[in-house]
Amino acid sequence: MTTHQLVMLIWSLVGLSVFIYLFFQTAPYGRHQEKGWGFEISSRWGWILMESPAFYLMLIFLILNFSNSSHFSIFAAILFMIHYFNRSFIWPIRARIKNKSMPVTIALSAFLFNFVNVYIQGTWLFYISDYATSHFSSVPFFLGLSLFFIGMFINCLLYTSPSPRDLWI
């Protein structure tokens, strides 16, 4: 068993355990937040803390492997970083969050999740996969790319709309 497969197995077991645990305990986040989960930080800074590892770690993977990677892997990593730059920095700055906080335990557990998630994806993209240039013309690529840009378009609409109701009038 390779290291990557071992990490995948362990992470799958962690995911299954958390899935089962959350049937019995509601995660203290957002509208379900409760006191008693420890020290709290600003929701805006908590969001940046928990999402930014995805951007930075993929950037490190890209820098370390740029010269010996396929064009497809580089393109996929860049799309990933565009998404996580928006998710890590743009959204928290633009979000209508005032005087809200989150438990540090939630931010740190999401930080850990994002760190392991990017380790798995970056290892796949830059060390295991063997994507040929022909992947750029495949149906799954066009479907995924279309979905990516449709989601980006919807986010842009939501960012520029004063109210979500304005989109449906």
Residue ranges and their predicted role:
Residues 1-85, 91-108:
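Membrane-helix and juxtamembrane interface regions of eukaryotic multi-pass membrane proteins
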Residues 71-73, 134-144:
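Juxtamembrane helix-entry segments on the extracytoplasmic side of multipass membrane proteins
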Residues 106-116:
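Small-residue-rich segments of transmembrane alpha-helices in multi-pass membrane proteins
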Residues 17-27, 84-93, 116-123, 147-158:
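Transmembrane alpha-helical segments that form the membrane-embedded catalytic/substrate-channel core
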Residues 7-14, 140-149:
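Alpha-helical transmembrane segments
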Residues 159-164:
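Conserved small/polar residues in nucleotide/adenosyl-binding loops
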Residues 126-135:
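Membrane-interface helix termini and inter-helical loops of multi-pass transporters
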